[in-house]
Every structure is written in structure tokens, then in C-alpha cells.
From Swiss-Prot:
Residues 342-353, 621-630, 789-802, 859-887, 899-909 have a biased composition (Basic and acidic residues). This is ATP-dependent RNA helicase dbp10. Belongs to the DEAD box helicase family. DDX54/DBP10 subfamily. The Q motif is unique to and characteristic of the DEAD box family of RNA helicases and controls ATP binding and hydrolysis. InterPro entries: DBP10_C, DDX54/DBP10_DEAD-box_helicase, DEAD/DEAH_box_helicase_dom, DEAD_box_RNA_helicase, Helicase_ATP-bd, Helicase_C-like, P-loop_NTPase, RNA-helicase_DEAD-box_CS. Its main location: nucleus. It comes from Aspergillus terreus (strain NIH 2624 / FGSC A1156). Residues 361-515 form the Helicase C-terminal domain. The lineage of its organism: Eukaryota, Fungi, Dikarya, Ascomycota, Pezizomycotina. A motif (Q motif) lies at residues 89-117.
Length: 928
């Protein structure tokens, strides 16, 4: 029987099913016309042989027919052109329903991004996932698409089924927008719970039985505690920007929320980096998670060239300006895009166009999809104070600069990053925390103004350049205190360390770690300009003072380098090649500078043969103090003898090393002389002896007696059958140094996350997750020092209570507002999880939920009527009506008015007072 052809056909090329989805849809954006294919010849029906007389013949015919059909289908798909051909691994191959595919096409997604292609199939298999992806990589759709596919439609049973936690209000709004757009073909209800909105409105949302809850951790925990929510119905949980969640201090809230979730949930965690605290959280809250990380982000590109410059602390600003001016050739003044925008603005002022027309002209001048220019450079600084200082200094130098750091307002940060992406600025000064989620598609240069404290942070920084086959450069400023970290990086990368010009100009910047200094004259000119600016501009000088204080705190809190690198760095920094001019500078002026440095080194290394006492006596000709001269000569002779002995010992060690090297060459050098290369005049007894002759003649001596005895004593108690070493038997140093995730299927999350864990230093000196807080403050009320924990965990000094998980939460979360809201709405018990929902309840409480648009119901005080406007009396009447509505809504008497309708308590009180008056009036008079 011949080999059966593969079925179904290989998904090398797939047909576009968009036309099938949009057959009766007039809003389709598919411009490819539908062409009718020619009818294919169908095989004649085969006669069925129930007795099994010719089963083999039928099987062979079926196999031949299937193979022919597959071959023709593949041939036709290969000949198709345009948008009708989809590569394998598209959204159609993921098993999504037709409504969701239709929404994806309307959204504009044609091909899944790499993180979507890797993540969605794993999520569809009901596995917990830890995904590492930057902002802009499509990670929002990577977890929203499987969530909509799993939830499918609105459930008639009470209880939310999907939960998405975001660190900020803006990100939550963005996620809600994506959920609304991708869930258009379904009746799923989604709500947004963020701080700043009305609690009463959010009570109504949660009582309306939503399917998907998108919230910030603080507000969601507040509602959970206030409403006593049961989260046992949650099936799908997403922690979006998880590293940002921990940095913003939501660790306690996340722990409390996680404690209330069911164990059968599916948990997804997306982050740009993977700090140690996040790894511990994932191990505790996720069940056998799968780590998904793009391989291109885990290693340095082979097209990236690195240059390291040794510099003093006082010359760092001048060195930065020298790199921008002389190395990168950064132009000053406005960029080309900015000039184009100014021209478009000038043209729009001259022409009488509408506002819409002006906006279109500005969009033409600034193309949002335009990639950064060849001069685009990111400068990494240690703290936000350094960012402010460098931004002001570079602006003073005439460069077009943008900046970003962690505590910058979200809107301002977006504006600054967009200016850099569109080419309005050439330089972006950022911290590691702020740059974590920034995705720049094409970048030319990276400058490490402050050297990173971990090798993985260096890889994370320089990984933004040299992408898609393009060349890129990274320039790093290394002080003497940063030398241990440089050596750690050199060992981590496994590359050769080249100091100065010790190897000449034969260096490879892509494969070597090349360290050198700057030309002194050019560097001095830039340093003098910086000094002059600091003297003239007091604002920049004050910013530098603040940055210096912030640097002291940063130096105390950054990770320590390895002990071996710290020891080795002393000899590296003390060598003459540490400050030699970098091989990157190879012009005529540089050569003159090199010769001058050599001359200064010779002068600095000069040691006279006589002391000053001997020189003075020789000049005068009359020895004044012969005893002192004899003492000096005797000391010199002693020192000379010691020096000669030291030189002799050093020479002997060199000879021993040389002899050992010769033995190694004799054993392993393929270029060594063999027996066949011996000349004819040399006797045969000079040829190499065999191993058996050497064993018989000489005793093997490989180690000292003490080492041998130690080894024997160690092996004496080791039983190879039961002995278990503390080191793994299959240790591979090359694999330990690898950048990417360990090979395999990443089934072991602990092992897979070990190579990608990276802690970023916070840019404000704030403490991270699980770091102890020792600072205290004086409590005036209790007359004692108390911890600042209560001031910074969201409670603002209020009383704390223990939650269900044992974590501290603010006591204000249990304020009774939900009970008061239910009483005002005249509601009884809400349905429990699993019970049938009350449709009238959800429709009456929140009309905005589940609609096409999300509406905020926020009460604002009316603006005061302006007497100078024509509509003064109209506005005044409207304001008075609004005040009356507010007074009646507030409860009448509480707002200053009297309520005309009495409730049961008022009636009962009035009856009691009336009865007292009757009893009082019915008493007999005291008069006799």
C-alpha cells in the first residue's frame, strides 16, 4: 500500500475567507473582487463493495484522488497574488468563530503579530501564560481575542467571567475600546471600573451582571470589599503591564484580589520586563505557566557595534556633547520634519482654509508612520533628575530633544514619545523604567550616559537598535567606578576585552568590547562650554545639583558587581591603556594626540638614579654629610638587590609558563613538527616516544602530594551509587550565559524565567516590591514614631484592616456606601453567583452598560451666568432649575429645603409627639 498523502493540506498558503464572511455586508473594506473559479471535475461515484473484494483498489484510488486535489489546490494558491493569499499561522488558522473573524478584519488586523501568533494558540489550550511584550506589539489583542472566543455570549447566570487589571486609567480605557471593537458581533457586557468615577454608578454596573470587568486594582478591591463581591465565577484573569502594577504599589491589592479568585481560573500575565518580584508572584498565582518571549528581544543583534569610552565623572557632560557633535554628527536646530511643519503652518495661514483642511495639511507634514531618522538617538540616564538636567543642557546646546521618565504624566509622556517617533526631535532622554514600554521600530544610536548595573539591562537597552538587518551603534560612558560592571558585561557576552590601542586598529566593534578615551583637546572644549553654561544659567546649575544628589542615592541602591570583577577592575583601570585614545578616532589630530600621550607617559615614568641629597653634594663638590650619603647608598643597594631577585623570580615564572605552553603545543598544536617532517640528517632516536615507553620509563606526576591526598580523602567516602553532588552534572557555561530562554518547550517556568529575570532600578529612588521600609515619622496624636507605610499604601494615614488574604487594606473600603445605595434604590438582596440574573435590574440601574458607547454620568456644578452675554437670563433660569434639582435629589432638609413627603419614621415620630401633647393637655390643673 503506498504512503498516504498528508491530510489536510499543508498550510503554507491559505485562502482568504474574508469574502465568505462579508457576503452580504456593504461595509466591507476588502477591495479585492470576488472571481468565480472554474468548476472542477468531480470524480465519478465509486461502486461500493460491501463484501470487501476490492478494498485495496478503492483505497489506492482515493489516495491518488486526494493527492491530486491537494496538489492542484496548492498550485492555484501559489499562483494567486495580492491580498487573497494569507501566510500560514493567520487568524483563520486559530479556530476562531466567524463573528470574531469579522470583527478582527474590521479592526484592520490582517496578519497576527509575533506575540499574537505565539500566545493565542497557547491561551486557547487553557494554559496559564506569562508573556513578555513591549507596548505597541499587539499584546492587548493577544489576550482580548481568546477571551471573547471563550466567553462567546452573555451569560444569563449572575457573575462576571472575565477580569482585566490595568495599572492606569488611560490603559484601562484603551483596553475597553479594544474589547468593544472586537466584541461587536456578540452581546457581551463590559464595564470600566477606575478611580475618579462615581461609586454609585459603579455599584449599578456591577449589579447589572457584566461579563467582562476592566479595572484598576485599587478601585476593584474597593468595590470587592464594599459590595462583598463573590469572584468564584471568574474564569479568565489578565494582569496587563504587570511590572508597572508592582512598581505603582499595587502588590497588596493584587494579593488580596488573587486570594478571592477561584483555583480553576485561567491566568494571563503580560509584562515588558520580568522582575524577581513578578516571578515570585507568577509562581504563587499561576499554575504551571508557559513563558512566551520573542527570541529577537533576548540577544544582541550581530549588526550592532559597541564602543565604550573611559571618562571621569566631571567630564561626562562634555563627553556626551562630543559624541553627539563629532561621532554621530547630530545636526542642531529644528529637524526636517519640524521645518516642514512650519512651512505647512505658514502656507495654511496664507490660504483661507477651514480647520479641517489645516489639520490635513499638518498630517501631511507629520507622518505618524514615518520611522525615525538616521540621527535618532536614545540617551539612557539613571534617575529622573538626570533626565531633566540633560534635557535642559541639550536644549541649550541647540538639539531637538524629547524626554520621558516613570512619574511623567501619561499625556505628556505620549506627546514626547510621539515627537521622537515622528522626527520632531532627534534625541530622547529616558530612564530604564520609562523606556521599558516604549517601542521604537527603527533606531540608529543608543548612548548609555549612566552605565547599567546589570548585563541584562544593557542587552535590554541596546536591543532597540540594529533591527531588521540595519546597522546600529551603542556608545557607553564608563567611569572608574563602573569598571567592575563593564567586566561583568564582558564575561556575560563572552567577548574579548580590548583596552585602547594595545591591538592596534585591528578591532571588531561587533565582536569585541573596545574601551578607550577621548581626545583631550576636543573633550576639554566641550567641558569648558558646559562650565560656562552652568555659570550663566542658574536653572541648569540647580538641576545639576539635584541630579548629583540623586546620583548618590542611585549609587547606594544599585546592584553590586561581582567580587572577581571588582578585583580585576583595579588592574584594568590602573593600566596605561585604560585612558588611551579610542581606536574609533583615527584622524591626523588623533595621531598627534597619541604621540603626545606617549611622550607624557615617558616623562611621567622617568625615575632619577640619584636622590636630591646626592645631586646637591655633587654640584658643590664638598660633601657636607657623608654619613647620610653612605646610608642612602646602603639603602639603595639593598633595594637594588631585592629588585633583582624579584626580576629573577618573575623571569623564572615566565620560563616555566613558556615550557608549559610548549608542552601544550606539542600535545595539541596541529602545526607542530611531526615525524614525517624530520630531516634526513637527524637520527631516528630523536623521534617521539610512544605512550607505552613513557609509562614504563617514567612515573606519572600530575599534582602535589597534598592535592593527591586531599583528592583521595574526598573520594574515600563517596559511593558513586548513592552520592549526589550539589552541582548539576550537565552544567553548560555557554548555556548559562545564553541570552534567550532555555531550549525546549519552556514547560518549567522557573527554569525558563531564570535567564530573563531583570530588575530595573527605579528612577526616583522609591522602593520596589518586597523591599523593607525603615523610614518613620512623628505622630503628634499618639506622641511616638510610626511607620510611613500607612501614608503610602493608599490609606493616607487612616486605620488599616486585614483582608481575607491577610494583607492590609484601608478601613475606608468598608464604609457602608453600598448599603446606603441599595436603600436609596429600594433594592433587596442581589442575585448570588450562579443564580439567574434579573434583566429588569440591569436595565434600570445602568443604561450605558452594554451599549455601543460608554457614557460617564458625572454631576458638575453649573457655570455662573455671565451678565455681559445675551443669554444671561436664560442661563440664570437654567442654573436655578439645576440648583432646585440638586436640592431635591440631596434629600430636601439636608440641602436646606423641606421635604413635603413624610416617610414612616417621620409619621411615627409625629404620632408620638402628638400623643405626648394629648397626655400633657389631659392632666388636671394645679389650681384649687
Amino acid at each position: 500500500m503506498p504512503h498516504r498523502a498528508a491530510s489536510p493540506a499543508m498550510s503554507e498558503n491559505e485562502f482568504d475567507i474574508t469574502n465568505a464572511l462579508f457576503q452580504n455586508d456593504g461595509d466591507s473594506d476588502n477591495e479585492v473582487p470576488v472571481t468565480k473559479s472554474k468548476p472542477q471535475r468531480k470524480a465519478a461515484p465509486q461502486e461500493l463493495d460491501f463484501l470487501g473484494g476490492n478494498v485495496d483498489d478503492d483505497d489506492e484510488d482515493d489516495e491518488a484522488f486526494i493527492a491530486e486535489q491537494q496538489t492542484s489546490a496548492n498550485r492555484k494558491a501559489a499562483n494567486l497574488k495580492g491580498r487573497t493569499v494569507k501566510k500560514g499561522g493567520g487568524f483563520q488558522a486559530m479556530g476562531l468563530n466567524a463573528n470574531l473573524l469579522k470583527a478582527i478584519t474590521r479592526k484592520g488586523f490582517s496578519v497576527p503579530t509575533p506575540i499574537q501568533r505565539k500566545t493565542i494558540p497557547v491561551i486557547m489550550d487553557d494554559r496559564d501564560v506569562v508573556g513578555m511584550a513591549r507596548t505597541g506589539s499587539g499584546k492587548t489583542a493577544a489576550f482580548v481575542i481568546p477571551m471573547i472566543e471563550k466567553l462567546k455570549s452573555h451569560s444569563s447566570k449572575f457573575g462576571a467571567r472575565g477580569l482585566i487589571l490595568s495599572p492606569s486609567r488611560e490603559l484601562a480605557l484603551q483596553t475597553l475600546k479594544v474589547v468593544k471593537e472586537l466584541g461587536k458581533g456578540t452581546d457581551l457586557k463590559s464595564v470600566l471600573l477606575v478611580g475618579g468615577d462615581s461609586l454609585e454608578e459603579q455599584f449599578g454596573m456591577m449589579a447589572g451582571n457584566p461579563d467582562i470587568v476592566i479595572a484598576t486594582p485599587g478601585r476593584f478591591l474597593h468595590l470587592k470589599v464594599e459590595m462583598n463581591l463573590d469572584l468564584s465565577s471568574i474564569r479568565y484573569v489578565v494582569f496587563d503591564e504587570a511590572d508597572r502594577l508592582f512598581e505603582m504599589g499595587f502588590a497588596a491589592q493584587l494579593t488580596e484580589i488573587l486570594h478571592g479568585l477561584p483555583t480553576t481560573r485561567q491566568t494571563l500575565l503580560f509584562s515588558a520586563t520580568l522582575p524577581k518580584s513578578l516571578v515570585e508572584f507568577a509562581r504563587a498565582g499561576l499554575q504551571e505557566p508557559t513563558l512566551i518571549r520573542l527570541d529577537t528581544e533576548s540577544k544582541i543583534s550581530p549588526d550592532l557595534q559597541n564602543a565604550f569610552f573611559s571618562v571621569k565623572s566631571a567630564d561626562k557632560e562634555g563627553a556626551l556633547l562630543y559624541i553627539l557633535h563629532e561621532v554621530i554628527k547630530m545636526p542642531t536646530g529644528p529637524t526636517e520634519v519640524a521645518q516642514r511643519l512650519q512651512e505647512e503652518k505658514a502656507n495654511s495661514k496664507d490660504s483661507k482654509n477651514s480647520k479641517k483642511r489645516k489639520r490635513s495639511e499638518m498630517d501631511k507634514a507629520v507622518n505618524m508612520k514615518e520611522s525615525p531618522t538616521k540621527h535618532s538617538t536614545i540617551v539612557f540616564a539613571a534617575t529622573k533628575h538626570h533626565v531633566d538636567y540633560l534635557y535642559s543642557l541639550l536644549r541649550e546646546a541647540g538639539f531637538a530633544v524629547s524626554y520621558a521618565y516613570g512619574s511623567l504624566d501619561q499625556t505628556a509622556r505620549k506627546i514626547q514619545v510621539n515627537n521622537f517617533r515622528t522626527g520632531l526631535s532627534n534625541i530622547l532622554v529616558v530612564t530604564d523604567v520609562a523606556a521599558r514600554g516604549i517601542d521604537i521600530p527603527i533606531l540608529a544610536n543608543v548612548i548609555n550616559y549612566d552605565f547599567p548595573s546589570q548585563p541584562k539591562i544593557f542587552v535590554h537597552r541596546v536591543g532597540r537598535t540594529a533591527r531588521a538587518g540595519r546597522k546600529g551603534w551603542s556608545y557607553s560612558l564608563v567611569r572608574d567606578a563602573d569598571a567592575p560592571y563593564l567586566l561583568d558585561l564582558q564575561l556575560f557576552l563572552g567577548r574579548r576585552l580590548v583596552l585602547g590601542r594595545e591591538h592596534g586598529d585591528q578591532v571588531d566593534y561587533a565582536e569585541d568590547v573596545v574601551v578607550g578615551g577621548f581626545p583631550r583637546d576636543s573633550l576639554a572644549q566641550n567641558c569648558e562650554w558646559v562650565t560656562r553654561v552652568l555659570d550663566d544659567n542658574r536653572d541648569i546649575f540647580s538641576q545639576r545639583t539635584v541630579a548629583t544628589k540623586g546620583e548618590k542615592l542611585y549609587m547606594r541602591t544599585r546592584n553590586a558587581a561581582s567580587l572577581e570583577s571588582a578585583k580585576r577592575s583595579k588592574s584594568v583601570v590602573g593600566s596605561d591603556h585604560w585612558t588611551t585614545i579610542h581606536p574609533l578616532f583615527s584622524d591626523a589630530e588623533t595621531e598627534m594626540e597619541i604621540q603626545r600621550e606617549k611622550m607624557l607617559a615617558r616623562i611621567g615614568g622617568y625615575r632619577p638614579q640619584e636622590t636630591i641629597f646626592e645631586v646637591n653634594n655633587r654640584r658643590s663638590g664638598k660633601p657636607e654629610n657623608e654619613e647620610a650619603l653612605h646610608t642612602i647608598k646602603r639603602v639603595r643597594s639593598t633595594l637594588d638587590s631585592k629588585k633583582k631577585r624579584a626580576q629573577a623570580e618573575e623571569q623564572s615564572e615566565l620560563l616555566e609558563d613558556a615550557s608549559g605552553g610548549n608542552e601544550g603545543e606539542a600535545n595539541g598544536n596541529p602545526d607542530a613538527m611531526s615525524d614525517d617532517d624530520i630531516p634526513d640528517g637527524v637520527p631516528d632516536n630523536m623521534s617521539m616516544a610512544s605512550e607505552s615507553d613513557l609509562e614504563v620509563t617514567f612515573s606519572s606526576y600530575s599534582q602535589s602530594k597534598s592535592d593527591k591526598a586531599k583528592k583521595d580523602s574526598t573520594a574515600a567516602f563517596q559511593n558513586p551509587e548513592y552520592f549526589m553532588s550539589y552541582t548539576p552534572s550537565s552544567t553548560n557555561l555557554a548555556e548559562d550565559r545564553a541570552y534567550g530562554v532555555h531550549t525546549g518547550t519552556n514547560a518549567n517556568f522557573t527554569q525558563a524565567s531564570r535567564s530573563v529575570t531583570m530588575d530595573l532600578q527605579l528612577d526616583e529612588g522609591a522602593r520596589g516590591f518586597a523591599e523593607p521600609r525603615t523610614m518613620k515619622r512623628w505622630d503628634k496624636r499618639h506622641k511616638k514614631y510610626v511607620s510611613r507605610q500607612n501614608d503610602e499604601d493608599g490609606s493616607k494615614g487612616e486605620h488599616l484592616v486585614r483582608g481575607e488574604s491577610g494583607a492590609k487594606i484601608a478601613a475606608s473600603f468598608r464604609s457602608g456606601k453600598f448599603d446606603a445605595w441599595k436603600k436609596s434604590k429600594r433594592l433587596g438582596r442581589l442575585p448570588r453567583v450562579g443564580e439567574a440574573e434579573d434583566t429588569s435590574l440591569s436595565a434600570g440601574l445602568n443604561s450605558a452598560m452594554g451599549g455601543k458607547r460608554f457614557r460617564h454620568h458625572k454631576d458638575q456644578a453649573p457655570k455662573r451666568a455671565d451678565p455681559l452675554r445675551d443669554d444671561f437670563y436664560k442661563k440664570k433660569k437654567k442654573n436655578e432649575a439645576a440648583k432646585e434639582r440638586q436640592m431635591s435629589r440631596a434629600g430636601g432638609a439636608a440641602a436646606g429645603g423641606k421635604s413635603e413627603i413624610k416617610n414612616t419614621d417621620d409619621i411615627r415620630l409625629a404620632r408620638k409627639l402628638k400623643q405626648k401633647r394629648r397626655e400633657k393637655n389631659a392632666r388636671p390643673s394645679r389650681k384649687k
